[in-house]
Amino acid sequence: MIVTMKAMEKRNKKLWTLYLAMALITPCLSLRQLYATVYAGVPVWEDATPVLFCASDANLTSTEKHNIWASQACVPTDPTPYEYPLHNVTDDFNIWKNYMVEQMQEDIISLWDQSLKPCVQMTFLCVQMECTNIAGTTNENLMKKCEFNVTTVIKDKKEKKQALFYVSDLMELNETSSTNKTNSKMYTLTNCNSTTITQACPKVSFEPIPIHYCAPAGYAIFKCNSTEFNGTGTCRNITVVTCTHGIRPTVSTQLILNGTLSKGKIRMMAKDILEGGKNIIVTLNSTLNMTCERPQIDIQEMRIGPMAWYSMGIGGTAGNSSRAAYCKYNATDWGKILKQTAERYLELVNNTGSINMTFNHSSGGDLEVTHLHFNCHGEFFYCNTAKMFNYTFSCNGTTCSVSNVSQGNNGTLPCKLRQVVRSWIRGQSGLYAPPIKGNLTCMSNITGMILQMDNTWNSSNNNVTFRPIGGDMKDIWRTELFNYKVVRVKPFSVAPTRIARPVISTRTHREKRAVGLGMLFLGVLSAAGSTMGAAATTLAVQTHTLLKGIVQQQDNLLRAIQAQQQLLRLSXWGIRQLRARLLALETLLQNQQLLSLWGCKGKLVCYTSVKWNRTWIGNESIWDTLTWQEWDRQISNISSTIYEEIQKAQVQQEQNEKKLLELDEWASIWNWLDITKWLWYIKIAIIIVGALVGVRVIMIVLNIVKNIRQGYQPLSLQIPNHHQEEAGTPGRTGGGGGEEGRPRWIPSPQGFLPLLYTDLRTIILWTYHLLSNLASGIQKVISYLRLGLWILGQKIINVCRICAAVTQYWLQELQNSATSLLDTLAVAVANWTDGIIAGIQRIGTGIRNIPRRIRQGLERSLL
């Protein structure tokens, strides 16, 4: 057996060498060349800051300022908005660096500038006014009756006027009164020395309507739908939308009115929620109704020269104490809201100890910051919120209870009214808001608040105080835009495939498809979470579906721009819409130009002849493991190099096509008869004749060499020719020997055509013999190869048989050894088992005989 194994080992050494060589060669054979392929409309994006445009359902017949502004500045909303979920996609959001907030701030400033459009310069009121108190007015809205002189149409003539002013709108002068009236002092309007005061007109209803912000073509808006998302960080539940939800541009301080509620728990947003002195934006998960009223008043129109000025009527105001404005709310529900806010904050900071959470009034500042400031139908309210923020909660962990309850179910906020207001837009005074006739009522929903902590959070501190704050309107817009971000959809990407573009192509069969690559952004992104291979199969269908929606969007933009041009009101929003449209067109043209330079115009998948460099990352495994977004991040540093190589290859392709088109001139037979071509034809003929002569010489040399190697001497080129003897010549015998009529070989000249025929015939025969020999040689090689493969197969079969025999032999040996071991073990066990059994039997017999032995002993003793 040992001899057999050694023989087998010796025989298989060569086979092991062959197997090792095949194992090394096989991976090399499997590495196929990859080529760069351009894919259009892939789900790849990057953060961007384009110009957004707005959409709204404005009522064209309404005179309300928001409607007028929206009808002129915004396009109609989409009746069937698209929202595509992005599965398996995560992205980072940061509301504190979101440019959408900045743009909305600019837009709302534009809205207010138009809604409170100044039309009358009020510089004539910046004069000394003699004012007296009015009995019956409340402390919150103290009023004075003032007399002042104004210039009439005739400049050198003065006229005395009377008007009512709120004390908060007046500034006392040190001048003494020229009259002897009691309680009379000299006043002027506030801030007359710092700015020009203008009157807002006309004063009508001021009810904000929802405005949707939309991304232009080629861009998309990501929306985070996670209920626990607070505006900063990574979101894992993302959808793609064309426009945001409807946002009501309600301007207020301290409280957020008519906003969007939090879907889950109360949301608290801040740059650092632990730091004191920083704004904390609170979004509630339930609303609290607040109703604000201003009683009936009369107004009077005063003609000052060619201008009209409106003020409160003097006749119906004196003695009327019901002029106080106020806001009502449910104090019990408000206390619950503050309690939930405190508990939510403690939950976010992971509080575990006991602490007192206090809500206190504003610490001071401008009237717009220390009071709840908002606009109600054109009147500017300044409401004292000290009662709303007068709560203390005793908390243990994240559970709080009310320590002081000083209010009933109904809460009332006293409010001031001002005619000369400080504009929140640019932080200056100078807007005179004329009083509105009649009774004013505004019903709002409290959906949030803006707070500040007195001190930085410290778990060892037992007291935390929150105060309301306001003034930065961007915080209000952040509550609406915290879960949005704008991205630019990259029109194309590049990836390696095994398919290469033909090196030369006349492009006669290129498909003419007008694909707007710069406009593919919604449905394409819906496949963002899929792998590259899965996403590439659905691009064509989504592209066709989405292109129609983008075309409609562009048409709506164009209609809005045309309407503004007809109304001669191409304002900043009209310019913004025009920029959005031009941006889309410029993006489209730029993308189409790049695709044209690469030879990919009109193609969704464009194969190129650029070989994928092994130094570039990526192989065929990326199609099943990576998404397009992940792949784009990996090649971001080398994509420009790849595109340059594609452009160079396309330039070479164009040059090759030019040469190919030049050869296409052979298709016209008339070009053959051109006199300028004749010299070229003669040149070709000379080349052909020279080639034939050269081949003839080579054949002669080869034949001579062959004959010399076979032992023959070279003969002159002769042809047989039968020579007829002249008549009358007697025949002779014997002298020359042989037959007299035998033909003789003598040289004979030939013509050009017979010689050409002979040469061609000889060349063809020689080529035929050469190819025949080559075919026979190939046949022999194939037969040898087949024989070798057959022998190799036989050897492999023999090796398998030997392996099977060896395996069978060893199995049999193992079986025999196991059987022998079991037999030996059985014999050994049997030997010592028999002794044990015999011993046990003896012991048992002895025990069994004990009674008998006892009986026998007793019998003997009795005998």
UniProtKB/Swiss-Prot annotation:
<dbReference type="InterPro" id="IPR000777">
    <property type="entry name" value="HIV1_Gp120"/>
</dbReference>
<feature type="region of interest" description="V5">
    <location>
        <begin position="460"/>
        <end position="469"/>
    </location>
</feature>
<keyword id="KW-1170">Fusion of virus membrane with host endosomal membrane</keyword>
<feature type="region of interest" description="V5">
    <location>
        <begin position="458"/>
        <end position="469"/>
    </location>
</feature>
<feature type="disulfide bond">
    <location>
        <begin position="600"/>
        <end position="606"/>
    </location>
</feature>
<feature type="glycosylation site" description="N-linked (GlcNAc...) asparagine; by host">
    <location>
        <position position="237"/>
    </location>
</feature>
<keyword id="KW-0899">Viral immunoevasion</keyword>
<keyword id="KW-0945">Host-virus interaction</keyword>
<dbReference type="GO" id="GO:0019082">
    <property type="term" value="P:viral protein processing"/>
</dbReference>
<feature type="disulfide bond">
    <location>
        <begin position="214"/>
        <end position="243"/>
    </location>
</feature>
<dbReference type="InterPro" id="IPR037527">
    <property type="entry name" value="Gp160"/>
</dbReference>
<keyword id="KW-0325">Glycoprotein</keyword>
<keyword id="KW-0165">Cleavage on pair of basic residues</keyword>
<dbReference type="GO" id="GO:0019031">
    <property type="term" value="C:viral envelope"/>
</dbReference>
<feature type="disulfide bond">
    <location>
        <begin position="54"/>
        <end position="74"/>
    </location>
</feature>
<keyword id="KW-0053">Apoptosis</keyword>
<dbReference type="GO" id="GO:0005198">
    <property type="term" value="F:structural molecule activity"/>
</dbReference>
<keyword id="KW-1160">Virus entry into host cell</keyword>
<feature type="glycosylation site" description="N-linked (GlcNAc...) asparagine; by host">
    <location>
        <position position="396"/>
    </location>
</feature>
<feature type="disulfide bond">
    <location>
        <begin position="376"/>
        <end position="442"/>
    </location>
</feature>
<feature type="region of interest" description="CD4-binding loop">
    <location>
        <begin position="362"/>
        <end position="372"/>
    </location>
</feature>
<dbReference type="Pfam" id="PF00517">
    <property type="entry name" value="GP41"/>
</dbReference>
<feature type="glycosylation site" description="N-linked (GlcNAc...) asparagine; by host">
    <location>
        <position position="637"/>
    </location>
</feature>
<dbReference type="GO" id="GO:0039654">
    <property type="term" value="P:fusion of virus membrane with host endosome membrane"/>
</dbReference>
<keyword id="KW-1164">Virus endocytosis by host</keyword>
<keyword id="KW-1162">Viral penetration into host cytoplasm</keyword>
<feature type="glycosylation site" description="N-linked (GlcNAc...) asparagine; by host">
    <location>
        <position position="404"/>
    </location>
</feature>
<feature type="disulfide bond">
    <location>
        <begin position="126"/>
        <end position="192"/>
    </location>
</feature>
<feature type="glycosylation site" description="N-linked (GlcNAc...) asparagine; by host">
    <location>
        <position position="180"/>
    </location>
</feature>
<feature type="glycosylation site" description="N-linked (GlcNAc...) asparagine; by host">
    <location>
        <position position="445"/>
    </location>
</feature>
<feature type="glycosylation site" description="N-linked (GlcNAc...) asparagine; by host">
    <location>
        <position position="330"/>
    </location>
</feature>
<keyword id="KW-1015">Disulfide bond</keyword>
<feature type="disulfide bond">
    <location>
        <begin position="119"/>
        <end position="201"/>
    </location>
</feature>
<feature type="glycosylation site" description="N-linked (GlcNAc...) asparagine; by host">
    <location>
        <position position="458"/>
    </location>
</feature>
<feature type="region of interest" description="Immunosuppression">
    <location>
        <begin position="576"/>
        <end position="594"/>
    </location>
</feature>
<feature type="disulfide bond">
    <location>
        <begin position="383"/>
        <end position="415"/>
    </location>
</feature>
<comment type="similarity">
    <text>Belongs to the HIV-1 env protein family.</text>
</comment>
<keyword id="KW-1043">Host membrane</keyword>
<feature type="short sequence motif" description="YXXL motif; contains endocytosis signal">
    <location>
        <begin position="712"/>
        <end position="715"/>
    </location>
</feature>
<feature type="short sequence motif" description="Di-leucine internalization motif">
    <location>
        <begin position="862"/>
        <end position="863"/>
    </location>
</feature>
<feature type="glycosylation site" description="N-linked (GlcNAc...) asparagine; by host">
    <location>
        <position position="59"/>
    </location>
</feature>
<keyword id="KW-0449">Lipoprotein</keyword>
